[in-house]
Every structure is written in C-alpha cells, then in structure tokens.
C-alpha cells in the first residue's frame, strides 16, 4: 500500500466503506479540522468549480521536491485559458470551469498544459482526473 496504490484494480468502484475512529478530545479535533480547512481555502480554489487536483505529481517526487503545480507554474501556465476553462491563479494544478466550459475546453486546456510542461522541463504530466468518454468540439 502507498499514497497512490491500494492493491486493488484501477477501475474498482467503492460503494461503501468502514472507518475505525480513534477517540480524542473533541475541542482539539475540531480545532485541527478548522486549521486544515483554513489551509485548504488559502491554498486551493475550494469555492470554484473544479475537478480537483488535475495532474499527478511526477513519480519519485519527494514531499519538498518536484510537484505538478511547480512544473505548471514554471511553464507559464498559471491563468492560461481555453474558452471558459482556466488554470487556477491560486493553485495551478486545478482547472476551473468559469461557467460554460465544455469537456473539450477542459481537455484542450489540460493537454496544452501537459505539452508546455514537457517542452519546458522534459517532464510528462499524467492526468489525475479520471476522464470518461470522449470530449467533442
């Protein structure tokens, strides 16, 4: 087991789960949850329409090293737009739908980002978002 692998098939669909909770001080737990939530709001576009983190961090990326968002930013993609789809200004590993972006807009934007990162750094980014079907113009 690891961050990205749980020993199950990639296409497995989970319909329920059972969690084992550990008892703790309620006030401390609430404070920690609020701190985590505040950090996410400060660093990610949580109030925007996104599919979440768009690209996986490159294999072998250490916690302080090579990150997809850093590669995207270095390739000049922060704020890049196709139609109503945009690379987030706040965290550039998120693609935002500003209202009427089509699947084709998002696909084109994502592939443009991948190509620019490859051209700039030699690193191929892999989609983290599971795309289904085909995007049509």
Named regions from a protein language model:
Residues 1-108, 115, 119-137:
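Phosphate/pyrophosphate- and phosphate-bearing ligand-binding catalytic cores of soluble enzymes
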